[in-house]
Swiss-Prot record:
The record marks 165-166 as: Involved in the stabilization of negative charge on the oxyanion by the formation of the oxyanion hole. It comes from Arthroderma otae (strain ATCC MYA-4605 / CBS 113480) (Microsporum canis). Its EC number is 2.3.1.35, 2.3.1.1. This is Arginine biosynthesis bifunctional protein ArgJ, mitochondrial. The lineage of its organism: Eukaryota, Fungi, Dikarya, Ascomycota, Pezizomycotina. Substrate binds at residues 204, 233, 244, 331, 471, 476.
Length: 476
């Protein structure tokens, strides 16, 4: 059975915050359920928090303190992202059957508006507003309406998407939140400081705010500069279909709603649907992108245009960087692992195998222990369910470690035959934070290795003692 994909609804905006540089996780970093402030960001990660940015025209943001979680007495936990003009929007949502109230409300809003006329996103951290019944739905709608009202909108249908993250099964302190929305609106700004504070406001067990931005051009307007910015949160309960992961992406490029949804869906399948921290899929996952066209130019209206092809590459790279950043901040993580499955008869089967390896507790714990136990990797390949017959042929399968320093691969298994492994070199490779595992299927039964075989990439982290500590103490 192929890995499930994040469900796409209508035309929704995607918002995602990422860092442009890799982040080094710190073992033993104690995580508190609150938005990180400067003093709590691990020293090794502070340098990856951007000191400046290039932000899209027409967007303003704010991060305010509402005290959603009683223990949070000062950190921002209410975020507002707002466009001065109506946006095309696209979004993807969790496929968990117990979809949180904000997921239901936002997906409904996008369907009603066909991805048009969206103005912003309001987010609270500290309470997921999931499995909260009719009251939870009412509260999510109230947040959307309040954001509209504070920005002078009085339409019957709301135009603000809603996101929440935190503990499941608890009602929002809704009056506390609603009373702070006017402050969030008055604090809206387009400065780097405002974007950074907003990225902090959506964090929970994250150890640092994840924010990035970049400029780009399109073939139809090579002299025109566009910008894209994103923020995200996520460190645990991470596995497609997305998993306590919220992402907000904003761009000033002109993109029509149906095309925007196509762009987002393509990028998600190769980014957020290709990561895993712990194999759990959250009730609240949402990634949205908003495009307000404020930078001008010819709107992207066709999937067959050169602008569409260029934008597809830009957005996919952007979301991949963000997705990788989430893995790098995985709860208790000490390793950032890329698993590449090569020469498969199909992309779907290759991705399914990569996902199975990434979710294996035995593989993850071996990597944490710096144990080159490649048998666990091979075992995961062998028990991957519902593959197309002939995908995995033992005598054609090879496994190797690819070091982060660019040196030669360490071959562990070649065409089904074990290699004489240099344990010293294997141990040296596993001392590094970054590692790539390469599984070559040799074309499966077809034997088409190197001649058009399909490849898939997945990113994951290891399991450490700290992961258990963090999640054992999550509600305390």
């Amino acid at each position: 059975m192929a890995p499930k994909q994040i469900r796409t609804i209508g035309q929704v905006s995607q918002y995602v915050c990422l860092l442009s540089k890799p982040v080094s996780p710190v073992s033993g970093q104690v995580r508190q359920f609150t938005s990180p402030v400067d003093a709590s960001i691990p020293a090794s990660k502070q340098k990856f928090v951007p000191s400046s940015g290039t932000y899209p025209k027409g967007f303003k943001v704010s991060g305010s303190h509402a005290g959603v979680k009683a223990s949070n007495t000062s950190a921002p936990d209410l975020a507002l992202v707002w466009s001065e003009e109506p946006c095309s929007a696209a979004a993807v949502f969790t496929t968990n059957k117990f979809q949180a109230a904000p997921v239901q409300v936002s997906s409904e809003l996008i369907r009603k508006r066909n991805g048009n006329g969206i103005r912003g996103v309001i987010v609270n951290a500290g309470c997921a507003n999931a499995v909260t019944g009719k009251k939870g739905l009412q509260d999510a709608r109230s947040m959307s309406k309040k954001a509209d009202e504070c920005n002078g909108l009085k339409e019957e249908d709301s135009s603000t998407l809603v996101m929440s993250t935190g503990v499941i099964g608890q009602l929002l302190p809704i009056e506390r939140i609603l009373n702070k929305v006017p402050e969030a609106q008055s604090n809206l700004a387009s400065t780097h400081a405002a974007w950074l504070r907003t990225a902090r406001a959506i964090c929970t067990t994250d150890t640092f705010p994840k924010l990035t931005s970049r400029s780009f051009s399109l073939p139809s307007s090579p002299d025109r500069t566009y910008s894209i910015a994103g923020m995200t949160k996520g460190a645990g309960m991470i596995h497609p279909n997305m998993a306590t992961l919220l992402g907000i992406i904003c761009t000033d490029a002109p993109i029509e709603a149906p095309v925007l949804q196509s762009l987002l869906s393509h990028s998600i399948s190769r980014s957020f649907n290709s990561i895993s921290v712990d194999g759990d899929t959250s009730t609240n996952d949402t990634v949205a992108i908003l495009a307000n066209g404020a930078a001008g130019g010819t709107p992207i209206s066709s999937t067959g245009s050169k602008d569409y092809t260029a934008m597809q590459s830009i957005l996919t790279q952007f979301t991949q960087s963000l997705a990788q950043l989430v893995v790098r901040d995985g709860e208790g993580a000490t390793k950032f692992v890329t698993v590449r499955v090569k020469n498969s008869p199909s992309y779907t089967d290759a991705k399914c195998i990569a996902s199975t390896i990434a979710r294996s507790p035995l593989v993850k714990t071996a990597l944490y222990g710096k144990d080159a136990n490649w048998g666990r990797i091979l075992c995961a390949v062998g028990y991957t369910p519902d593959l197309t017959p002939g995908t995995v042929v033992p005598e054609r399968t090879s496994v190797s470690f690819k070091p982060a320093d660019g040196s030669a691969e360490l071959k562990l298994l070649v065409n089904g035959e074990p290699e004489s492994v240099d344990e010293g070199r294997a141990s040296s490779i596993l001392q590094h934070e970054d590692l790539e595992i390469v599984v070559d299927l040799g074309g499966g039964a077809s034997g088409e290795a190197g001649r058009g075989g399909e490849d898939a990439i997945y990113w994951f982290c290891d399991f450490s003692h700290e992961y258990v500590t963090i999640n054992g103490d999550y509600r305390t």
